[in-house]
Amino acid sequence: MTYAPVKDVLSGKLAVDSEVTVRGWIRTRRDSKAGISFLAIYDGSCFDPIQAVVPNNLNNYNDEVLKLTTGCSVEVTGKIVASPAAGQAFELAATDVKVVGWVEDADTYPMAKTRHSIEYLREVAHLRPRTNVIGAVARVRHSLSQAIHRFYHEQGYYWLSAPLITASDCEGAGEMFRVSTLDLANLPRTESGDVDFNEDFFGKETFLTVSGQLNGEAYACALSKIYTFGPTFRAENSNTSRHLAEFWMVEPEVAFADLNDIAKLAEDMLKYVFAAVLEERRDDLEFFASRIDKDVINRLEQFVSSDFAQVDYTDAIQILLDSGREFEFPVEWGIDMSSEHERFLAEEHFKAPVIVKNYPKDIKAFYMRMNEDGKTVAAMDVLAPGIGEIIGGSQREERLDVLDARMVEMGIDPEHMNWYRDLRRYGTVPHAGFGLGFERLVSYVTGMGNVRDVIPFPRTPRNANF
């Protein structure tokens, strides 16, 4: 017996009149007065379910088929036939229906066929991939991640598995999750009364990583072009639609590169992955356009065909000041632009994706290369219409004396970063990279307004269920 994914049947990949078995779950069951039942079966391989037409002469029709409810798992064997109904080209003329798993109580099943709010679905995150919307998110997320890996592979980059446990704070923000095996009820103490981390598993303070960048720099300074793609963690007590405590980051790092090089890399990568998802996940994107955000497909197509605008931070601030717009957060040189400022630039002024460069040093991290003016660093943000910042990057400071001075200025002990400083001592090179928050990318592509709905099991303040 040939087992076939639903997508292969609906796409016409398999010949009409061929016999196949489809395995999946019941979306709906509809019974006609003529003694025929219509089962909508989905298996997650594509957005649409396949319709199985089940006659009442099957042995288990009355005892089982007529008792099937949303969520039951089945194996249905039958012939592929042309569908007379509108909506799909093919359906299954069933000759056998095997019930694999029943829903215990159809009346209390959390994923009954009525539509649920996104907020409710977060409470049943283990069941929400069974819905149209979260299933579509999962497929889009997969296609985006595979496109990212393809892009970097085709460009000659090596994928680096950066460590999740670290003693370094890349961002210098201090909002990190501590990793410890010490007994919280009986902490070892030094003579001064501080916690004695020498007694801990690693013999020092360790944390979950906020970024793979610093480790990526080490490998870029040997392999020339690398990227990391993995989970990162921020202990930031932010309950917003844009923040997660655990999220995924894409972080390329390139030796012998400057700010302009990675600005071009960011543009090329985004256009590549958006073109890929438009081609691979059209059915899912059409669903998002009809139910979530009508501009999803048009926005992605425009993004792929647009030339990115570029502007210096100083000029961007002047544009905001000259706009006459009364922003919620006042505009002045030196601010870290808020989402409303970023979206004004991308959506109303440039009407295109825009790369803002050369930010004030006081709002950026210690590792960003100091510009000749002594006031700004070679940093960039990519701002996308509809969401604002989607990528942040910089040229890294490759001069040891300047890096040391910057760390001291920001209260970081250079001795704690000796391994990082070694990269400047031994064959230093100009290098640059950026970070892309993967969940923000998925949110942008799907139109889902909250990053909690584009990661399988969101981790947020006061929430680590499942």
Swiss-Prot record:
One of its GO terms (biological process) is asparaginyl-tRNA aminoacylation. Keywords: Aminoacyl-tRNA synthetase, ATP-binding, Cytoplasm, Ligase, Nucleotide-binding, Protein biosynthesis. InterPro entries: Aa-tRNA-synt_II, aa-tRNA-synth_II, aa-tRNA-synth_II/BPL/LPL, Asn-tRNA-ligase, Asp/Asn-tRNA-synth_IIb, NA-bd_OB-fold, NA-bd_OB_tRNA. It catalyses: tRNA(Asn) + L-asparagine + ATP = L-asparaginyl-tRNA(Asn) + AMP + diphosphate + H(+). Disulfide bonds: none annotated. Homodimer. This is Asparagine--tRNA ligase.
